[in-house]
């Protein structure tokens, strides 16, 4: 383990009263990254730098990460965003105004006479993923709050999960249907595919898995 990672882990452990942090690295890697991901010390160090900068607790998934091209995309959960907003010295409350089409968040600062106001639109933000289908207004409210907080307090280098997923998708290879011109993003999880193959008990199940994983690629 690198000196930087040891130092950052110890600092995090002290912040949350968890001893010296000597046995926490493997737990952190399992908590902060998708199961089965091979996490490097450099990736873990990068995440802990951000966690320490914003005072976020990775053990409760206030912050976690998506691996990306050897680096990471730091993802802050809703509880994490709530923490860094409410802990800001100049935070003086927020308001929301919402209808079926949009949500406007207004954040007030103690040191400014004019509040910061941001509007997010359902037509621009809604996706086909589960939360956006089951709780679209709640998701839009979260989006408006986070974008407003960025402008009000200058938070940078961190993302919410929806943004992180869009970043990963943008970097993923694309498949184009020559007949229709339709573009499909290929999200192929190599580690998950290998795990599925290794779990096969016979040639028949292997053929089934191989066919299913091949269709994804």
PLM segments and residue spans:
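Polyanion-binding surfaces on beta-sheet-dominated domains and ring/shell assemblies
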Residues: 1-192
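Charged/polar low-complexity intrinsically disordered segments, enriched in acidic residues
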Residues: 185-206
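Amphipathic, non-membrane alpha-helical rod segments
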Residues: 203-217
């Amino acid at each position: 383990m690198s000196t930087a990672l040891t130092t950052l882990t110890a600092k995090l452990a002290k912040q949350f009263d968890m001893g010296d942090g000597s046995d926490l690295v493997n737990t952190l890697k399992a908590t902060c990254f998708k199961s089965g991901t091979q996490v490097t010390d450099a990736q873990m160090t990068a995440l802990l730098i951000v966690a320490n900068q914003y005072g976020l607790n990775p053990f409760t998934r206030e912050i976690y990460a998506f691996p990306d091209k050897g680096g990471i995309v730091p993802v802050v959960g809703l509880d994490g965003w709530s923490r860094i907003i409410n802990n800001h010295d100049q935070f003086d409350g927020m308001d929301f105004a919402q209808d079926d089409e949009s949500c406007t968040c207004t954040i007030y600062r103690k040191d400014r006479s004019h509040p910061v106001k941001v509007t997010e639109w359902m037509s621009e933000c809604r996706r086909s993923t589960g939360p956006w289908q089951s709780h679209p207004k709640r998701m839009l409210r979260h989006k408006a709050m986070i974008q407003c907080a960025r402008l009000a307090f200058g938070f940078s280098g961190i993302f919410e999960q929806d943004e992180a997923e869009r970043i990963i998708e943008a970097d993923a290879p694309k498949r184009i249907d020559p007949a229709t011109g339709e573009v499909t993003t290929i999200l192929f999880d190599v580690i998950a595919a290998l795990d599925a193959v290794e779990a096969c008990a016979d040639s028949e199940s292997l053929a089934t898995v191989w066919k299913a994983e091949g269709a994804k690629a």
